[in-house]
Amino acid sequence: MTTRIDLRGLLPQELEELAVRLGEAPYRGRQIFRWLHARRAKGIEVMSDLPRAFRERLALVAELPPVRVLNRLVAADGLTRKLLLGLGDGNSIECVLMIYKDGRRRNTACLSSQVGCAMGCSFCATGQGGLQRNLTASEIILQALALGAELAEGEGGNRISNIVFMGMGEPLNNYEAVMKGVRIFEDPSGWGISHRRITLSTCGIVPGIERLAREKPPLELAVSLHAVTNELRDKLMPINRRYPLEELIPACRRYAEITGRRVTFEYALIAGVNDRREDARGLSRLLRDMLAFVNIIPLNPVAGSGFKGVPPAAARAFVALLQEAGLEAAIRDSRGQDIAAACGQLRFASREVL
């Protein structure tokens, strides 16, 4: 049995090539792209400006797998929602929608890049189940479609304004599919999301950061740091044993210099572990004279980790120390803790729900 092509994961030029192979003019491919990513078509049969005969030929070789929402959780504030999505092979992934009703009216989609994660960070739930596989570009797009459908008309329609690759998985270990997704999201004839509104978060894959610096894809870079010494970072984030700070920080500096874009460093404050004054001073020294911003993250509870967060006053004091040293820093708004949708809490919930 021949596997049909999943249209959502194709770039405009790939859809144009498909149209030509099926005996149509290239512009038909761009029409298909608009149906998929501007009109959010759920089936080939609704693409009414395509000739019926072409739609019939297309349906023989291509498909649009349905969005399968297995579970849906809404935070008490109603503004954070977590979806468990079923994939065609029986695996499942989680993604999160965060609605901000401030002056900028942002609707942020937090997307997964892998089923599970191989990084094994000690304070993160995702890695507890290990890595199953990479997601395809289509499966990445599917998450945004599902989250966009969550938005009511009064909340900006189904317009996703921001994309963050901060869900399950390490995006730089699924580089090709993630970058393909980014290019689809950025295309003005579809989602039309500016590169300033697409953020990729990595635990510190140095070759991937160097590739980002060379290729300059349309996105912003965030790096999960969480410690200022190799000794501590080795314990918190095993990837540091492969790419220690003396390799990671210079790679980030080069990225900032080459692209002209600042690097955001994420730092989860863990009580009694990385929250001392000397940690703040070490962080200031590490990032001195770099185009950088520090996001201080309130640690979110993860069963079995043994870690605890710090009181809000302590987090504010830590930020003040960084700012006094000349670093740009702020406390990141943490959303969705009550539905395990916050940073570090996504996992194989399907084992608990189904």
From Swiss-Prot:
This protein's name: Probable dual-specificity RNA methyltransferase RlmN
Enzyme Commission number(s): 2.1.1.192
UniProt catalytic activity: adenosine(2503) in 23S rRNA + 2 reduced [2Fe-2S]-[ferredoxin] + 2 S-adenosyl-L-methionine = 2-methyladenosine(2503) in 23S rRNA + 5'-deoxyadenosine + L-methionine + 2 oxidized [2Fe-2S]-[ferredoxin] + S-adenosyl-L-homocysteine; adenosine(37) in tRNA + 2 reduced [2Fe-2S]-[ferredoxin] + 2 S-adenosyl-L-methionine = 2-methyladenosine(37) in tRNA + 5'-deoxyadenosine + L-methionine + 2 oxidized [2Fe-2S]-[ferredoxin] + S-adenosyl-L-homocysteine
Keyword vocabulary terms for this entry: 4Fe-4S, Cytoplasm, Disulfide bond, Iron, Iron-sulfur, Metal-binding, Methyltransferase, rRNA processing, S-adenosyl-L-methionine, Transferase, tRNA processing
Compartments where found: Cytoplasm
Gene Ontology cellular-component annotations: cytoplasm
Cofactor annotation comment: Binds 1 [4Fe-4S] cluster. The cluster is coordinated with 3 cysteines and an exchangeable S-adenosyl-L-methionine.
Signal peptide positions (record): none
Main enzyme class: transferase
Principal localisation: cytoplasm
Gene Ontology annotations of biological process type: rRNA base methylation; tRNA methylation
Additional detail: Reaction proceeds by a ping-pong mechanism involving intermediate methylation of a conserved cysteine residue.
Superkingdom assignment: Bacteria
Residues reported to bind S-adenosyl-L-methionine: 169-170, 201, 224-226, 300
Cofactor(s) annotated in UniProt: [4Fe-4S] cluster
GO MF, one annotated term: tRNA binding
Annotated active site: 94 (proton acceptor), 343 (s-methylcysteine intermediate)
InterPro entries associated with the record: Aldolase_TIM (IPR013785), Methyltransferase_A (IPR040072), RlmN_N (IPR048641), RNA_MTrfase_RlmN (IPR027492), rRNA_lsu_MTrfase_RlmN/Cfr (IPR004383), rSAM (IPR007197)
CDD domains per record: Radical_SAM
A Pfam family recorded for this sequence: Radical_SAM
